[in-house]
Amino acid sequence: GTDRFELYRETAGLGGFDASNVAYDKLSSGRYYRAADGDTALGFYEGPNFHQTLVFNQNIVATHRWNVEHQSSLGYNLRYDEIYSNVLGGDFGDVYLVPGWDGYTMDKGASTTDFSFFVEHKYTRERVQVTAGAMLNYHDVPTGDSSYFFAPSLDVLYRLTKDASLYATANRSMRYPTYTDLYYNRGGAQGSLDLSPESAWNYEWGYKQKSGQVYTSAALFHRRSKDLIDWVSYAGDPIAYASNITSLALTGIEGGMQYNATKRKALLRNAVVQAAFMRGVTPEVDFSSLYALDYLQAKINARATQRLGLGFFLNYSITLQDRVGTYRSVGGEEVNYDPFALLDFKLYYAPAGGIFKRQFPFQAFVNINNALDAAYYDRGNVIQPGRWVSTGLEFRFR
């Protein structure tokens, strides 16, 4: 199928709603106009974005156990994807009609081929388990340039007891630019065909334990990234540019505790507490980062499910979050992200015997997200949704 993205609502009645009061119409001049209040869309807007994608993926893995202690695996992954669009990609000469949308065409496109070969060996003896592996990746980008990437990995596990263990991991990872990063050029955003893949070395040391119905974990981690892909803007320039910006070193700790009841009639079905704290080191820069440098320096989440009786249950969750960095206000000022707290609830009815006397799992629910109606920003100068109430039914057939 074809994806359609509207910056301004143009189609009245989508989703069963009467949108005649909010829909924009295209004038003969090419501008978009809303008759209900006389509002005119921004001048750069030329209509909805259409994207049609095709993805082929093949993955083959072979594993051989040599004996009780040694096991080897090797395999490869092949991925090919292409996109046809009216926005993303290079001009390919031909013009295609957008299926199901009269009057719209796509005249741009691009494709990528990604091939990975990997090998891994696992050694297990008594309390020790060591896994070492490596991946060689070939990536053919839309510009015709190709690149190779080598990613080794090492995992070590030591069992202190039957239910407790220490572990350490080290690996290298990478991320290639998306079609949006490469080609998007509308509304004050400019992609770049000169982007390089970003890469990172990741290290983690941790502890895991299970004691009865309680799971506990704690870890120390470190990540060193370079050639980060980000959208950046400079003082006095309204354009956001896709760029490989800089390096970033993140060091942090995370931990959590989880309780799962073994009996359905338990008053407290489950409870989870998770926390993560990190600090970053990066060179001084003369631009504003959209997301790569604006990392979460603190996040705490606690959630639980409580049985109320008669088939009713209540989920509640509280999240505390503190993000570093800034965003640019409508007036062009740099504004620091403020910490915020979110409270969410879910009340649902799920009878143990299902419905229709057929043991079909059933759930009727009401969700209340951001119950305290907190006003906050999380990414860029976009205020996040306030209190959001939704309801629905869920059936599972087996």
Language-model features: where?
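C-terminal beta-signal and adjacent terminal beta-strands/loops
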Residues: 273, 323-327, 347-398
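Residues on the lipid-exposed face of transmembrane beta-strands in outer-membrane beta-barrel proteins
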Residues: 58-64, 117-123, 154-158, 205-209, ...
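Extracellular loop and loop/strand-boundary signature of outer-membrane beta-barrel proteins
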Residues: 41-49, 61, 100-107, 137-143, ...
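Transmembrane beta-strands of outer-membrane beta-barrel pores
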Residues: 2-4, 78-84, 125-127, 134-140, ...
